[in-house]
Design a protein with these regions (language model features):
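Polytopic alpha-helical membrane proteins, predominantly small-molecule transporters/carriers
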Residues: 2-288
């Protein structure tokens, strides 16, 4: 048996009969809902419940690893397991981003660069292992594990990118630069800690436009559908981070972490029900 699976089709079509949900508009609505929930739930666990960024990251990453193992071991697609794993990746990516940028003191510019390098490495490992442009080829156990590692890394990168776009200064939550592991090193060598400071509203709108641009490229050009898929995944995470902050912070809706998280759980559940009915109707149409 060959170690690296191969496939004849460079499309996403084969995923519908394997372990990934059908890639359509409802899929992306669920992804955006999940990533936005990840931002508010991550802040709720680390800040409101006072787990801290390190403690929250440890708990959430442990849950993510367990969910990933179950997802990989399941022989067939289970939508609830897929979305549970994706949501845990989104929440864990939020707390991991805050731990890297704030607790370690890397700040937004250097933190985003560090996580981007990790994202390129995991995506390259996934592509090398599958030896294909077909996302379906990643569904052996190692390839699927690399897929989920890339999802987690893209969530972490997206969160720090969203924070860097929207925030002007790095909030150290009462710490000083000297309290962090790398803060003094970063500032001493001329790296900034803060972000661009567009604000949550402007960042959310800009990222929505960028996501729409990815959709247009996907539908209207011959660019690889898998490249567009990963581009969409990466864009949805900073969009979720900016939208989540817009819902919770003073310059947005000011709902707070708890109420925003509760609201987004309801939204995610509603979108999931709509997606289930849509996919069921789609399957019934194909069966006729």
């Amino acid at each position: 048996m060959s170690m690296n699976p191969s496939t004849n089709s460079p499309t996403l079509a084969s995923n519908t009969s394997k372990k990934l949900p059908h890639i359509n508009g409802m899929y992306w609505a669920l992804v955006v809902s999940s990533t936005t929930l990840g931002e508010t739930a991550g802040d709720f666990i680390s800040q409101t419940l006072d787990f801290g960024y390190g403690g929250a990251s440890a708990v959430l990453l442990a849950l993510f690893v367990i969910a990933t193992i179950l997802q990989v071991l399941f022989a067939k697609q289970h939508a609830w397991m897929y979305w549970t794993t994706l949501t845990l990746a989104s929440i864990g990516g939020t707390t991991l981003c805050d731990w890297i940028t704030r607790s370690l003191g890397l700040g937004y510019p250097l933190g985003s660069l560090t996580i981007f390098i990790s994202l390129v490495a995991t995506l390259s490992a996934w592509k090398w292992w599958t030896r294909s442009r077909d996302l379906g080829a990643a569904l052996d156990k190692i390839g699927e594990s690399l897929y989920w590692l890339t999802i987690l890394t893209s969530s972490t990168f997206g969160t720090v990118l969203g924070d860097m776009l929207s925030k002007n200064e790095l909030d150290l939550d009462g710490q000083t630069i000297g309290d962090t592991l790398f803060g003094e090193f970063v500032t001493r060598h001329g790296f900034g800690l803060g972000g661009i400071g567009f604000g949550d509203t402007a960042s959310t709108v800009a990222l929505l436009v960028l996501l729409a641009a990815v959709a247009v490229v996907t539908l209207k050009t011959r660019v690889s559908r898998v490249s567009c898929y990963w581009g969409g995944i990466i864009v949805t995470h900073p969009l979720g981070a900016a939208a989540g902050d817009f819902m919770t912070k003073d310059d947005g809706l000011h709902l707070g972490n708890a109420w925003a998280t509760l609201l987004l759980v309801v939204v995610l559940a509603a979108v999931a029900v709509l997606a289930y009915r849509n996919n069921k109707s789609h399957a019934a149409t194909l069966a006729e």
